[in-house]
A protein has these predicted regions:
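TM-loop-TM module centered on a large, flexible mid-protein loop between adjacent transmembrane helices
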Residues: 105-107, 112, 144, 218-225, ...
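Membrane-interface loop-to-helix entry segments
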Residues: 152-215, 246, 269-273, 401-414, ...
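C-terminal membrane-solvent junction of multi-pass transporters and transport-like membrane proteins
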Residues: 362-369, 412-477, 501-515
Length: 516
């Protein structure tokens, strides 16, 4: 029954054609109006642009101060291994069923419509709130040059700019995001070269080698003293590492708009993961050997260049011109991330609407294939950035960081679970995995590995609130979990959905490999 490998028919204009062979009218804004005009390079840089941002350029400094250079490095490698399990699992599903929104659809089809509903809305909330976070960060970064300017000006300007950009045809959007992301990649590559030179003795510190791994030391204790404190320090920065990596899974979000997904999605996933993993681990490693973890500047609450470990490294080396350059790059980084935030959030809304978990008008598209109602709704949440005008910017930044980071781990856990159920469905329906365009390695063990540690990090991320009880810290750590549970329970009570049996799971609709 599932032996045919013929691809799903597509129109000459490249629009997504449903598996039943019908084609929707792009002008009417009906479901299926998204265009397959993205190339693999667009998908790669879309994910890179959404990933490399404030988490790496700002959050990594505080992470090194908390856990020490080696503790932070191990944390980034460890979370990177979890991300690998997530991305390979997502790649297998997205290559076989390349639909807009990807994993929220998979949750509804393979596990339970309730999970798809809760996962989709939480993930949308995550990216919509992150858009507000990046707008706030952009204003704070510009204040580095002129603190008298109100960030409200820049929130307004950038909100209007990125809302407009996301109404453009997707291939133009993809090209713009590619150039945005390229600036960040070049910056990190340049910093690595700079760090090698500084470590070798070019700067005023002289030859460093691994001195900072010895003094003040490779690990820092947090909350408690001794070995237990060092482990606590390591575990406490996993959320920061997760926030930094969050966005790499965007290659799955764009699967419904990419040309030739059977080849393009695996290529995009491969280059995206190894590119992001290599850049992140290298950056954290080199920061750890040229900046001492006890440098007080690492713990600054500022969101401009003064708090960036890249700038701190330059100051320690005696390079005075670099802070302005890094601040400009930071601005580019957060603006690029903001651009992809609106894209990813809007496509999740389209996926939710296709699964009847959101109003159907979210699927309306214009002649360019842009889901304009979904874009407008996601962009509107960015206006919450104005809340920063009445509170300390650092407090807002930290609160949003924790909320979005935990929501990201929840999404990763759900992706792993979706893949496990996807493999169960294939087995129950006698579809050999060897017939898929791409098969994830080390399965099912790798997906179980990712699921276990994602859940463990989610449950333990707020442990500090229990050691020295703090209601605000508890709420910050678990508000995403609470919201997720409320969405699950609410949808289940109102809709009375039943878990999907493996033999009944829909593994054909939207598949580019037509059934026979």
């Amino acid at each position: 029954m599932f032996g045919s490998k013929e691809k799903e028919p597509q129109s000459s204009e490249g629009e997504v054609t449903p598996s039943n062979g019908s084609k929707t009218d792009l002008e009417t804004g009906e479901t299926g109006g998204l265009h397959r005009t993205l190339h693999s390079r667009h998908l790669q840089f879309l994910a890179i642009g959404g990933t490399i941002g404030t988490g790496l350029f700002l959050g990594s400094g505080k992470a090194i101060a908390t856990s020490g250079p080696v503790g932070c490095l191990i944390a980034f490698v460890f979370v990177g291994s979890i991300l690998f399990s997530v991305m390979t699992a997502l790649c297998e599903m997205a290559t076989y069923i390349p639909v807009p929104g990807a994993f929220t659809t998979y949750a509804s089809r393979f596990i339970d419509p309730t999970l798809g509903f809760a996962m989709g809305w939480l993930y949308w909330f995550c990216w919509a709130i992150t858009f507000a976070l990046e707008l706030t960060a952009a204003g704070l970064i510009i204040q580095y040059w002129n603190s008298d300017l109100s960030i409200a000006i820049f929130i307004s300007v950038f909100w209007a700019l990125f809302t407009a950009l996301n109404f453009m045809p997707i291939h133009i959007f993809g090209e713009l995001e590619m150039w945005f992301a390229s600036i960040k990649v070049v910056t990190i590559a340049g910093f690595i070269v700079f760090a090698v030179c500084v470590n070798a003795g070019v700067g005023q510190q002289g030859y460093l080698g691994f001195d900072y791994w010895l003094h003040p030391g490779p690990f820092n204790a947090s909350i408690v003293e001794g070995s237990a404190g060092k482990f606590v320090g390591f575990w406490s920065v996993l959320i920061t590492a997760g926030f930094s990596y969050q966005g790499a899974e965007l290659v799955g979000i764009g699967a419904g708009e990419i040309k030739d997904p059977e080849k393009s999605v695996p290529s995009a996933v491969r280059w995206t993961f190894w590119g992001i993993f290599g850049l992140f681990v290298s950056t954290v490693f080199f920061i750890g050997i040229i900046v001492p973890s006890d440098d007080p500047s690492l713990m600054l609450d500022s969101q401009d260049a003064s708090a960036s470990p890249l700038v701190i490294a330059a100051k320690l080396a005696g390079v005075k011109v670099l802070p302005d350059i890094i601040n400009a790059v930071l601005l580019t980084a957060v603006l690029s991330a903001a651009n992809s935030n609106v894209y990813s959030g809007s496509r999740i809304l389209v996926s939710l609407a296709n699964e009847r978990c959101a109003p159907q008008f979210m699927t309306w598209t214009n002649k360019f294939g842009t889901p304009y109602m979904a874009v407008a709704t996601t962009s509107a949440v960015g206006l919450l950035a104005y809340m920063n005008l009445s509170a300390n910017g650092g407090v807002v930044f930290d609160w949003f960081l924790n909320v979005t980071a935990v929501a990201g781990f929840i999404s990763w856990a759900c992706i792993n679970l979706c893949h496990i159920r996807f493999m169960d469905a294939l087995g129950a329906q006698n579809i050999p995995r060897s017939s898929l365009p791409y098969t994830a390695p080390l399965q099912p063990y790798l997906s179980w590995y990712g699921l276990f540690f994602n859940v463990l990090i989610i449950l333990t991320n707020g442990f500090a609130a229990f050691i020295d009880w703090s209601t605000s810290d508890f709420f910050t750590a678990y508000v995403s979990v609470i919201l997720f549970i409320v969405l699950l329970v609410g949808h289940k009570l109102f809709n009375r959905t039943m878990p999907v049996k493996a033999v009944d799971a829909d593994v054909t609709t939207g598949s580019l490999r037509a059934t026979s």
